[in-house]
Curated annotation (Swiss-Prot):
Purpose of the protein: Catalyzes the ATP-dependent phosphorylation of N-acetyl-L-glutamate.
Designated gene of the protein: argB
Native organism: Caldicellulosiruptor bescii (strain ATCC BAA-1888 / DSM 6725 / KCTC 15123 / Z-1320)
Primary localisation category: cytoplasm
EC number of this enzyme: 2.7.2.8
Site for Transition state stabilizer, residues: K33, K251
Catalytic activity annotation: N-acetyl-L-glutamate + ATP = N-acetyl-L-glutamyl 5-phosphate + ADP
Molecular functions per Gene Ontology: acetylglutamate kinase activity; ATP binding
Name of the protein in its database record: Acetylglutamate kinase
């Protein structure tokens, strides 16, 4: 009996620990970039959907921006189309664009919306074409000074924040696929990390969170010690020193850009940890790395 009571008291203590964080975030917006292994592993996916649904029920407004690289790769492989990347960006010809739009908007997005709704959330799936949410233009990449045409790869020109504000007002959880639209109606495939940061900036989110497949940032890649908090200047120095590279660069640069445009806190989370969102937001220790100005 005493063991059972101790267990109940421990659960109550955890809830009380979360109280000040709940009070601080009540009515605020949190943008979550959902990607990595947490999108592939069904258990992790289930936990993430539970976290997001709980956020909504306690008065936080979550906005989910998702990738879909593995799903796109799978379909392209079946079509015998080889994937090519330049500086981490997918080269997107017409056929690849059609596949990306079909997969991101028609498959990945709807699966996430369905899961959230099954958990009791009130989710709605949208992409940048809907309501001109993500207005975009063609993006060129530069390699050793050479201008590279990536096809239908876009960059964000502006975000129509009113669309997201309207959905939040009606208690919806927006789930955003990173497809943007140009002035002439052309669809563009856009890096989901960039889209998440731009949305966070446009709506002045309280938090921007990137789910990744790493524990967090480290001063030494071989070290087990994770940096719990780091300034934007230190992050830029680590990029110069080669301590941050690859797919982590657009994430941390997105964090810094968001911070400079009114977002209060940005986080790099290990999406492989069960309930990583709740652990970061509602516990004293948190997990992953917080980036601040």
């Amino acid at each position: 009996m005493y063991e059972e009571m101790d267990s109940l008291i421990e659960k109550a203590s955890i809830l009380i620990e979360a109280l000040p964080y709940i009070q601080k975030l009540y009515g605020k917006t949190v943008v979550i970039k959902y990607g990595g292994n947490a999108m592939i592993n069904e258990k992790l996916k289930n936990w993430v959907m539970e976290d997001i649904t709980l956020l909504k029920y306690i008065g936080v407004n979550p906005i989910v921006v998702h990738g879909g690289g593995p799903d796109i790769n799978s379909v392209l492989k079946k079509l015998n189309v080889e994937s090519q990347f330049v500086n981490g960006l997918r080269v997107t010809d017409m056929q690849t664009m059609e596949v990306a739009q079909m997969v991101l908007v028609g498959k990945t997005n709807k699966e996430l919306v369905s899961m959230l709704n099954q958990k009791g959330g009130k989710a709605i799936g949208i992409c940048g074409i809907d309501g001109n949410l993500i207005q975009a233009r063609k993006h060129y990449e530069y390699v050793n000074g050479e201008k590279i045409d990536l096809g239908y790869v876009g960059e964000v020109v502006s975000i129509n924040a009113k669309v997201l504000e309207m959905l939040a007002k009606d208690e919806y959880i927006p789930v955003v696929a990173p497809i943007g639209v140009g002035e002439d109606g052309t669809s563009y495939n856009i890096n989901a990390d960039t889209v998440a940061a731009e949305i966070a900036k446009a709506i002045k989110a309280e938090k921007l969170m990137f789910m990744t497949d790493v524990e967090g940032l480290k001063y030494d890649k071989n070290s087990k010690k994770i940096i719990s908090a780091i300034s934007a200047d230190e992050v830029l120095k680590m990029i110069e020193e080669g301590k941050i590279d690859g797919g982590m660069i657009p994430k941390v640069l997105g964090c810094i850009d968001a911070l400079k445009h009114g977002v209060n806190r940005t986080h790099i989370l290990d999406g492989r940890i069960p309930h990583c969102i709740l652990l970061e937001i509602f516990t004293d220790k948190g997990i992953g790395t917080m980036i601040h100005l």
